[in-house]
């Protein structure tokens, strides 16, 4: 089962918290669609700010948006001008007061979305996908990841027939629920079409009780300094 499901969704309520935190009645669908609209808008508006996750919390009159990013200075701007502009733009979407919190990702090499976005950006700039993937894997293992796997699918190097290739270092125990695995899917837009880049990063195992807030686990992993990643197996699989 662990091989077929999204690793994040599979661990919700166990070691991972939800990224939308609010209660809804008959307006549940509208709020969910609004959350999706907010996330898409932020990722498009801040495409150069290395935004990873957008966590949304709601009360009756306030929407709190927490943005996790590796480049907070771009979002905040000089004297906070840019974040004030963003707040006004989000008010038009929600018709409510908006509060924006910025959380800095200090180790982007261990964030699956940022790793995938980096690989996708290099592919769009015509850098060899093998080189981009191997560099990303090496960087993650240097930052003490216990394992990382990257899979790329599509018309690789402009081939007429689409295929998939995966590269792995360390261990990714997808069926172990206490395994803290980050996952992301990012698309690269090339002249030959879209390429899908999937990233799994194993950060360690969680024992005992854990507060199910997305930021708790993120803060813990950013400050984590452990020994070298377990498992030395390096493998590549082609389909």
From Swiss-Prot:
Q: Which GO terms describe its cellular component?
A: cytosolic small ribosomal subunit
Q: Which domain of life is it from?
A: Bacteria
Q: Which keywords fit this entry according to its UniProt record? A: Ribonucleoprotein, Ribosomal protein, RNA-binding, rRNA-binding
Q: Recorded GO terms, molecular function?
A: mRNA binding; rRNA binding; structural constituent of ribosome
Disulfide bond positions: none
Residue numbers spanned by region Disordered: 218-239
Describe, as the record does, how this protein assembles with itself and its partners: Part of the 30S ribosomal subunit. Forms a tight complex with proteins S10 and S14.
Q: What family, per the record?
A: Belongs to the universal ribosomal protein uS3 family.
Q: Which protein are we looking at? A: Small ribosomal subunit protein uS3
Q: Which organism is it from?
A: Christiangramia forsetii (strain DSM 17595 / CGMCC 1.15422 / KT0803) (Gramella forsetii)
